[in-house]
Structures are given as C-alpha cells and as structure tokens.
Amino acid sequence: MKNSFSEYNPKSKDEIENLWKKAIFIFDSNILLNLYRYSEETSTQFIQIISELNNRVWLPFQVGLEFNRNRLTVISDQKKNYTVFEKKLNDLIEEVENKNRNPFFSKSLLEKLSIVKDEVKSEIEAKIKVYDDSITSDSILEKINLTFENKVGVNFSEEEIIKIHKDGEKRFKNRMPPGYCDSKKPENEKYGDLILWKQIIQKSKDSKVDVLFISDDRKEDWWLDHQGKTISPRPELIKEFRTETSKDIYFYKPFQFLEYSNEFLNSEIKEDIIEEVKSYKPDLFKNDNFIQLNLTLQGSIEDFNALFNEMKNTGYNILKESNSVNDFHYLNIFLPNIPDLERRLNSKYISKLSNYNLNLIDIKKS
C-alpha cells in the first residue's frame, strides 16, 4: 500500500540521505529575507551553508523577484523594531525614575539603571546604523548575489503567466495547493506561490533532478497540519510533483535544514543558532489588535449561507468561501483581540453549529 500512497508516508532514513546526496536545494524568498531578521551570527552561519552547497543551489525567478521587492521593507521593519524597543525602554526608565509616586527605588539602583540604559541605548543606535547603512551598502545582499550568481531561473513568458493565473482560479476554488491562502491578495500578488511552484516543477523536469525546498512559509497550503502540529508537506504537492517530473521532492523548514545540514553536510551549527531560527516568528503572524478564526464547515450551501448572513447582520467581520464538490465551506472571522468577544462567538455560534445543520471539521486561530 505504501507504494500507492507514498506521498502520505514519512520518508525512511535512507530516502532522506539519498535526497541530501543528490537533490538540488531551492530556497524560498522568506529564507533569504529572514537573513535580515536573525542575529548577525545566525545570519552569517546560514548563508555560509547555502554558499557551500555551490552548484547544488538554484533560485527560481519568482523567489529573486519577491526577495528584491521586499528587501528594503524588511530592513525598515527591523530598524523599526529597535526604535519601538527604545521608546518602550525610555518610557519604563521614566516611570522608574519618577520620584513623586510609587514605586520608589534607591538612589544606588537608579544609578545602576542609568548605566544600563546608556549601554542599551548605545547598542540600539549601533544596530539602527547598521540597518541605515544596509540601504546603500548591504553585505547580506552581496553574499546572496555572489551565492546565486548564474544560478537564477528565467521568468515565464506573459502567455505562460496568463495561463497559470487561469489555472490558479480553478485550483483556488477547489482549495488545491499551493497559493489558495493568498486568494484575497491583489490580483498581481495572489498567484505568486503558484508561479513559484510551477517554476520548481519546470526546473526539475528540465534538469532531471530531485528537489529539496526550504521555506519558512507557514500556511496550510504548503504544509499538512494536524491538531496544530506540522506533519509533512501537503501530499497533493508531493504527488503532483512526482506525476509531472518523475522525480522526488521534500520540504524543510529553516531550522530542519540546519539540523540535517549537521547530519548530512558535516556542518557544525550550534544548538543555540538552530533554536533561534526555530523560535523566530515573522511579524506578519503577530498582530496585537485582532485575532482571526478560520473555520472549516460541512453541510448544505443553503444552511451555510443562512449562518453567514445571520453573523454578517449581527456585525461580525467575516469572509466566506465554498466548495460545491464536497460541501465544505470556509469561514474567516476577524475579531478585536478582546477575550470576551471570542467567548461570546463560541457560545452563540461555534458551539451551536448543529442548530444550523453544519458540522465543524476544523478550526484554526491566528
């Protein structure tokens, strides 16, 4: 049975080792952009491993495009992180140094705090200068350009792009990965993941090679999740790749890439570096102002629309999508990050879906 459904089965140690010996390595744009988000030591180690892969690395045109489009924004965001932290620190120090109200602190403690404040401020200013300088003189960009010199794919023609967009419309309606999680993006952005996927497939077909794809994209249209835990790449993607290319592919998150590099490339990446990469969460997944609940429901379209219209009329900020093939429906609910609102939503609607003749298949919170 394993041969018939191999895309659902975990790879054996021999299969993994064979891929690491023969496959080419393809890195998503988020991997390259994360080099600006990691500490200097981690960033240096990461790009060093990529460079040592030499002719076994390849960059899809779509990855290069997204990296160059977003590089300056990421740099600015990192600078902003330091300026925001500096403001928070100054506000805290000002509160502590206030001698007219509780809490009251000793003079010696305040003197020590002042020294620490000056040291932290000095380091923050140094970090900000690094980001300011990197706008025009970027050592990370230089290393990336050197690593991928003559290893970048060509873009699809305009006709091919139009064809992919049309294919994407059909795939997204059926929630066929990858890319459907971006269906709400502007027209010129929402098919980016699908274009990337097609370029990866084309490279494998042209060069007749297996592929290891390293990505920090955490959306469900790339990864199979179960009860909040990532199990594997989406089986549909593995199957499609094998059908199209007669070759094999596997995905790794960045920390997994580092772990396996120690094992199969004889790298010597320290555990604290791997832990930093593993713990990193992109800013786009953090928003203190609202939460998003993604519900997968099953039932008739009429019952689903009745629920949707009632919630909409009640004032909920929601989006909907349906799959007529299997009667699956998808509800995206956006709530202000106020615990009582989530409790009331659960009490009034989610816990009583049976009253609407609907079954709750899955729920995700972000």
Please name every model-derived segment.
Residues N317-S322, I350-S366:
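Conserved short beta-strand edge segments in small beta-sheet-based binding/regulatory domains
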Residues S215-D217, G299:
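Short beta-strand/turn micro-motifs composed of small residues
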Residues K2-V211, R218-F285:
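Active-site-proximal, substrate-binding regions of enzyme catalytic domains
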Residues V325-N337:
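A generic structural motif
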Residues K286-G299:
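Short glycine-/aliphatic-rich beta-strand segments at the starts of folded cytosolic domains
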Residues S300-I301, F334-E342:
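Helix N-cap motif at beta-to-alpha junctions
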